[in-house]
Design a protein with these regions (language model features):
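Alpha-helical elements of the RecA-like P-loop NTPase motor core of helicases
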Residues: 4, 74, 123
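Hydrophobic alpha-helical positions that pack around
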Residues: 9-117, 129
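Short, internal active-site loops enriched in acidic
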Residues: 27-28, 146-148
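A structural signal for short secondary-structure junctions
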Residues: 94-95, 107, 134-135, 168-173
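Short amphipathic, charge-patterned alpha-helical segments
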Residues: 118-133
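Short loop-to-beta-strand transition segments
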Residues: 130-145
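A structural-propensity feature for long, helix-poor, extended segments
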Residues: 147-174
Length: 174
């Protein structure tokens, strides 16, 4: 990179960070819902409100507010760099792109992983996670956070995408 390019990027980063505010919310699970989140940031009780209006119409401090999961924002630079055709070429036609999973618990390889949508649970646990510790048998996994669901050994070949998981009563969390 040229010095001029690096200086340009640093100025952009400085401009972005000078407008960034970090707010500690109430921490309640319900504050993941958009209207509850905006209420919490405003110093009010983090309770979901009746819609309409939606947050894109009237959100934070009464102004239109776009709320997305940090994972969504993390995908933007690569989509801008490579284009939408590149991004939609990853994953499945119905669930394009990648998904981050926190691989934790009784597997050999733990960590945050990013995989194409449509990968199977078996591939995540055994190929990436290295299988169950101490050669023990797989029993079940909780997916998608508190409301995501539990999958058993008979569901190891389930595809990790929105439609496939919905069909078996589970969901991918944020």
């Amino acid at each position: 990179f040229s010095l001029r390019y690096v200086q340009f990027e640093l100025r952009l980063l400085h401009d972005l960070l000078s407008h960034l505010h970090i707010n500690r919310g109430a921490g309640a699970f319900v504050c993941g819902e958009g209207s509850a989140l905006t209420a919490s940031i405003e110093g009010k009780r983090g309770m979901p409100r009746v819609k309409p209006p939606r947050t894109v119409e009237k959100g934070l401090f009464g102004k239109p507010t776009v709320l997305n999961n940090v994972e969504t924002y993390a995908n933007v630079p690569m989509i801008v760099k490579h284009g939408t055709d590149w991004y939609t070429g990853i994953g499945t036609p119905e669930s394009p792109g990648t998904k981050a999973f926190a691989l934790t618990g009784n597997v050999n390889n733990t960590g945050l992983i990013e995989v194409p949508m449509g990968i199977t649970l078996r591939e995540i646990i055994f190929d990436i996670g290295g299988g169950i510790r101490d050669g023990k048998k797989f029993k079940a996994v909780q997916i998608g956070g508190p409301s995501g669901g539990c999958l058993t050994e008979s569901q190891l070949d389930s595809k990790m995408d929105f439609d496939s998981l919905t069909k078996i009563g589970a969901m991918i969390g944020s």
